[in-house]
Amino acid sequence: MLYLLDAKRDYYPITRIPEFWEWLIYQGNQGNIKIPIEVYEEFSDTKDENGEKDELADWAYQKEVKEALRFNEEAEQDLVARITYGGYVANPTDDELQKIGRDPFLISYALKDIKNRCIVTTESSRPSRQGANRHIPDVCRVFNIRCINNFQMIREMDFSTNWKNSL
C-alpha cells in the first residue's frame, strides 16, 4: 500500500518526536509513503510570522527529505478534472478553485490506483459541507478511495519511537 500524505501541519512536532520524522524519511525511501509535488510545495514554502521558513518547511527543504518523500509521478489532468468537477464543484469559479487548492491533485494520484494507494489526512469527514468547502475524506468517498488519518497510518504501519530496533 502506498500512503499519500496531505500537507497539513498537524503532525508531531519535529523537535519533540524526531523519530517520527526519521521514520517518514525511511518509509519514503522504501516507497511506502509519498507526498505529491503539488502538495509538497504547500508546506515546503511556508513562512512563520517573521517571514522565515518555519520548522516544517526547513525540514521539507532538506535534500534527503525531498528525495525520500516527493512523489515523482505526473498528475493526470483528466483525473484532476474528474475529482474537481465530480467531487467538489461542477462549474467552479476562480474563488472556489482557490479554496479547493491542491487537494484534487492529491486525490487524483490515489484514484489512479485505488487498490494500492490511500490518502492520509488530518481532515475529518464533514458530509454537510458542500462545493469548495468539502473535506478530503468526503471527496474520497465519492470515488471509493480509501482515506485514513495519520493515527490509522501509524497503527497500520506499526510505527513506534524505537522503530530502528526492528530493522
Please annotate each region the language model reported:
Residues 2-117, 125-126:
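Active-site-proximal, substrate-binding regions of enzyme catalytic domains
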Residues 116, 125-167:
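Acidic, PIN/NYN-like endoribonuclease modules and their adjacent C-terminal/linker elements
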